[in-house]
A protein has these predicted regions:
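Nucleotide/phosphate-binding sheet-loop regions of phosphoryl- and nucleotidyl-transfer enzymes
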Residues: 1-309
Length: 310
């Protein structure tokens, strides 16, 4: 029987850390508990090991399983990958058994291209959000998958803000962000020598390869050596349907703990930003608000978070 390399969150559980990695096992456990987790799937640590055995290639069997599970995600979400009617956008994250610095950063909004961004801009009536997602995706993919430094894109953002006489990214308009997306693609082409990928499957396989590659980057190797983590473990990959924190001031992103990390006290702790996406909280671009303020700004969401945390 063929090896199973991919698991829906609903197919796993919290005891499967060796196979699904820490993040994948916990997402599966939260799904089993009925928590409101955006659905997706985990590509196993065994797929990572196989990738290295195959000369750093994702073989046809694993690719076929990944695309089979994209189809299952499409059934769950009612959206389709690369579709021009109701497109599915995903995030891609690494997830080793043990938390490790130096592993691949997150890629958000994967599945966007020139055509799809136009569709979501029109359908949502929110072109600023659509082009914000697109420019972020180009920036993340270029940095994380193709190793084009973040600084080149940050410089273009700073130039655009100076041109518009604003200081915050959130003050840039839909037109500004559309222009930036074009500049980002030109920057990508000048650095890589080819056009930014438009095929969602190509984007997805590129992102998954980048996660597997990051298992053996210099920082990860040094960390493993210092902490007696075997190189044979490999890392899992989590592909999850997007939840958007950057659709407006009634949306947000944040980090939360169900206990005080310093004392262990049973108290919800964390911070959040409105109209932002994941990396904004830790990037230091804007100052996050303490999670207690969420009770005033978004009482329903706060109550749901409080209930879930118990």
């Amino acid at each position: 029987m063929a090896t199973k390399f991919v698991y829906l969150f609903s197919e796993g559980n919290g005891k499967m850390r060796e196979l699904l990695g820490g993040k994948g096992a916990n997402l599966a456990e939260m799904t089993n508990l009925g928590m409101p987790v955006p659905q997706g799937f985990t590509i196993t640590t065994e797929a990572c090991t196989q990738y290295y055995e195959d000369g750093e290639q994702i073989n046809d069997e694993i690719q076929a399983q990944i695309m089979e599970y994209i189809s299952k995600m499409e059934e769950i979400t009612g959206k389709k990958f690369g579709d021009l009617e109701n497109p599915l956008l995903v995030s891609v994250r690494s997830g080793a058994r043990a938390s490790m610095p130096g592993m691949m950063d997150t890629i958000l909004n994967l599945g966007l291209n020139e055509d799809v961004v136009e569709v979501i801009a029109k359908k949502s009536g929110n072109p600023r959000w659509a082009y914000d997602c697109y420019r972020r995706f180009i920036q993340m993919y270029s940095d994380v998958v193709m190793e084009v430094g973040k600084k080149y894109f940050e410089e273009l953002i700073d130039q655009m803000k100076a041109k518009r006489g604003v200081t915050q990214d959130v003050e840039l308009t839909a037109e500004d962000l559309k222009e930036l997306a074009g500049q980002f693609k030109a920057e990508y082409k000048s650095k890589i020598g080819q056009d930014f990928p438009t095929d969602p499957k190509e984007q997805l396989m590129g992102a998954i390869k980048a996660v597997f590659r990051s298992w053996n980057n210099p920082r990860a190797i040094v960390y493993r050596r210092m902490n007696d983590i075997p190189g044979s473990w490999g890392t899992a990959v989590n592909v999850q349907s997007m939840a958007f924190g950057n659709m407006g001031d009634d949306c947000g992103t944040g980090v939360a703990f169900t206990r005080n990390p310093a004392t262990g006290e049973k108290k919800l702790m964390g911070e959040f930003l409105t109209n932002a996406q994941g990396e904004d909280v830790v990037a230091g671009v804007r100052t996050p608000m303490p999670i207690a303020e969420m009770a005033e700004k978004f009482p329903e969401a706060y109550d749901c978070l409080l209930y879930t945390s118990k």
